[in-house]
């Protein structure tokens, strides 16, 4: 079973407008509301592919209940931890080919809630084979919270995938307990190392072999339309992908994480894991809906992806 963690979920609200006018009333004809957050995108894709997945994280208030109901409607198993605060809204205003986002900070997690959730996780770990952690940390949690979870998972011998950024990712990298997989894009890699990393293979090899990444089994670097670069133990791979018509790239990274988790839980070969991860990301980009893949197109796309050792 794959356990997904979304510690700062949201209700994602989309407001499509032909034109967005400031300092006046804008009337929206059609509104969509979905259970949001990077980890929930991962969850949906895994569920669509038929994987056994369990969603967890913090939920509170009426908005938290909305997320629970959406997941129930999708027949996705969940075990969230209830908090006193209210789950946040994230608003996207789609206008004139652009997207303006208004993101609420979200609830503040109390110290007792933070510690109690770790106990809750230990129970969930008994059922898990792989853990995928995605997104930002809510207010109130120390930036080392992901590092704490990785430590707990490592003690249980559970592989972990971490898709985060900023200080929470840095705290994990600087800790003694390393995740099994990280998935930075090239900009995030450059930011972590405070240098410019290019798509040149030698530049990428030098970057992912820096001491800060020591002990991490898999480093998978997204290169956008150029595919991906990966390091597994001491072996390097370049992933070449076919050209596709990109409809909506948002959520493609989350779908890639879903592919990695699926590859790990089925103990697939390096080549097949990388093919699956990239196929999931591309399938998401080919759809309008974020965190969604057309499973019927998977096999054909999988065949077109090339993984070479470099």
Swiss-Prot record:
- Show the catalytic activity: D-tagatofuranose 6-phosphate + ATP = D-tagatofuranose 1,6-bisphosphate + ADP + H(+)
The molecular function terms in GO held by this entry are: ATP binding; phosphofructokinase activity; tagatose-6-phosphate kinase activity
What InterPro entries does the record tag this protein with? Answer: Carboh/pur_kinase_PfkB_CS (IPR002173), LacC (IPR005926), PfkB_dom (IPR011611), Ribokinase-like (IPR029056), Tagatose/fructose_Pkinase (IPR017583)
- What's an example GO cellular component term for this entry? cytosol
What is the protein's name according to its record? Tagatose-6-phosphate kinase
Q: In which pathway does this enzyme or protein participate?
A: Carbohydrate metabolism; D-tagatose 6-phosphate degradation; D-glyceraldehyde 3-phosphate and glycerone phosphate from D-tagatose 6-phosphate: step 1/2
**EC identifiers of the protein:** 2.7.1.144
Record's Gene3D superfamilies? 3.40.1190.20
Report the sequence similarity comment from the record.
Belongs to the carbohydrate kinase PfkB family. LacC subfamily.
Q: Which organism is it from?
A: Staphylococcus haemolyticus (strain JCSC1435)
Transferase in keyword set:
yes
EC class, as a word, reads transferase
Biological process annotations from GO: D-tagatose 6-phosphate catabolic process; lactose catabolic process via tagatose-6-phosphate
For this UniProt record, the keywords arranged alphabetically read as follows: ATP-binding, Kinase, Lactose metabolism, Nucleotide-binding, Transferase
Q: Which gene does this sequence derive from?
A: lacC
